[in-house]
Amino acid sequence: MYYRTRLNEKIWKEIISILKICTILFAALVVTDTCSAQADVAPWGNITGVRIDGQLFPLQSSLGIARNNWTQISATAHERQRPKYNREGDKQIITTRIDSITFKEVVEDIGSGTIKVDIRSSSTAREALDAAFFRLTLSPKDYNLILVKSLKDRVLKSSIAKLPADFSTEANSIELTSAYSKATLTFPGSTTVIIKKDNNSNDSLYYIYIPLIEGTVTAATSTQKTFTISASGIIDHSPATFKLNTSIQGRPFDGFGGNFRLQNPKADPQVIDYCLNNMKVAWARVELPWRFWQPQLGEDPLLAAQNSKLNPRVQQAMEMAARLQHMNIPIILSAWFPPQWAVMGQLDMQPVNGIWGNPLDRGNATEIYKSITDYIIYLKNNYHATVSFFSFNESDLGINVRQTGAEHNMLIKGLGAYFKSHGLSTKMLLGDNSDATSYRFIYPAMNDPEAMQYIGAVSFHSWRGWDKATLEKWDSAATVLHKPLIVAEGSIDAAAWNYPAIFEEPSYALQEINLYVRLLSICQPLTILQWQLTSDYSPLAGAGIFGNNDTLHPTQRFWNFKQLASTPRGLFAMPVSQERTDISSAALGDNRKGIYTIHIVNNGASRNAVITGLPSKVSSLNIYVTGKNRSMKKGTPVRVVNGKARFHLDAATFTTLVSNK
């Protein structure tokens, strides 16, 4: 009997072990948010890496041309050309042009960590070139060893740091290796490989050039080159640990919001309706169509409005504000295009000699103040919409009123005082800058005590300047002034309207929400306003938007926004620390209410995670996940034991944890 019992125990242990293995295998078969391999390609043509099971194996490629004995290089980069981008199944297709050379690049995922690159190059004019090329940037931070091979034998084997400054050979493959990864370029035949050191860099950078065209080109010149890039290495599934500190409460976060600047009467309404009906919108920004409100200096816009002569653009903008106000959404009013009488010089909507916008005509300052104030008063009295803050959009850059920092300070004091004298509670936005990088623009007003009473909030747009040091400038400004911080235009690529197919790419969605989580953590904003919740930069696809004729439907970006927007209103920023560079996190909470939310973007492979520091009254966390194949999917609640919660982070996903008492 004893023997049989021990035997049964042994059998049961084996059965349990088999069941565990089956469970693991089943979990591996469950649909995840990444494919086995996928190229990360910027819409201007640069390959940034290959993702395998969510982990990015980095590359830095570009296309370009070389002149004057390789001393003059022009290469593809963000906002340097006007590329076109689209996807056809597993193929990403980019068409771009540098001077007379047109490139058509097709990057195709072909499985097993391998992508195929096909580049067709052609010329529209006769020109002497050293080469049109495909280029890889080599950094010791990514790879430390290079092996260039020919069919017969290796040609070059060297550490990246000790490469010759100028080297050329014929080769069939190039291998780049590091301690954890390898990337291999394989050519169907022998091809020229040129390696050159970047003498202008302090980071020991080298370039590998693969010529596509060499020598003088004519209008009839056309070439094609095809090769593969394979990536492999160790997939990092190591766990992540988050440490929450609830003893520090920073600035409040009202929630996620959006811009509602109307530009497309046909496509905008359906997107606006869907967003407002299906997502919690905490703040909104609308347009003052100033040039249509008062086109001429001598006109009385109030009289015209009272005589039913309100311009349709103005009426639509006011109706938009009224709709938002009816939903108890606070409003920011911004002006883009001024009327001619309000500015100096000939009004031009495009840059002149590289300079955008026109300065305000100081001689008409009183008339300018009155015109804007009349609009706000009319909006309040006739549409029952109250404007919380006013700004000129991106006046640091000139889109389309251009100001210096000193002029911006004068406007804040002058227009702010005019608002106050007419009984308005409307305050001025300090900044509303085009990018985080132009923070010096706000310094004159920051250092002027007289301006303080008229400033309602500090504001910038998130198109550029994402490094921590730059973002901390804005956090510091809000802290010093004791004012809220607003990201009045949130997104990541101001040129994306040129290649809108990128909006449906998981890589774009992940990069965008990653920035927002970093903004929450570093800047502690009152709100982030998506550019936009209309058909411009639409978070929806279909119904003819950007040429997509599918049924109207939300994209991954919409679900990212909805998940972020579901943060309980009015929570305070709280520190949450973790050491991984491929993860971003932000925490919000209210100790009095006992409510806590943690947002996490995992830019890498799947991994287990643990969070510590949760208050004892928190017994569980609701968990939501958005990724390529999941749309704010609610998972099994996560138990909290002794302030600690263990959960799983899926690859390349946005995860939100919300406390339950």
What are these regions (language model features)?
Residues 38-97, 262:
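Acidic-aromatic substrate-binding/catalytic surfaces of carbohydrate-active enzymes
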Residues 62, 66, 74, 86-90, ...:
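Beta-strand-rich recognition/accessory modules
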Residues 120-193, 618, 626-628, 632:
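Polysaccharide-binding surfaces and accessory modules of carbohydrate-active proteins
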Residues 221-225, 232, 637-661:
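C-terminal beta-strand-rich structural cap/linker in extracellular carbohydrate-active enzymes
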Residues 244-245, 279-446:
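Substrate-binding cleft and catalytic face of glycoside hydrolase catalytic domains
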Residues 377, 402-515, 522:
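Noncatalytic carbohydrate-binding groove/subsite architecture in carbohydrate-active enzymes
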Residues 484-563, 568, 575-579:
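Aromatic/acidic polysaccharide-binding cleft in carbohydrate-active enzymes
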Residues 577-619, 652:
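Carbohydrate-binding surface patches
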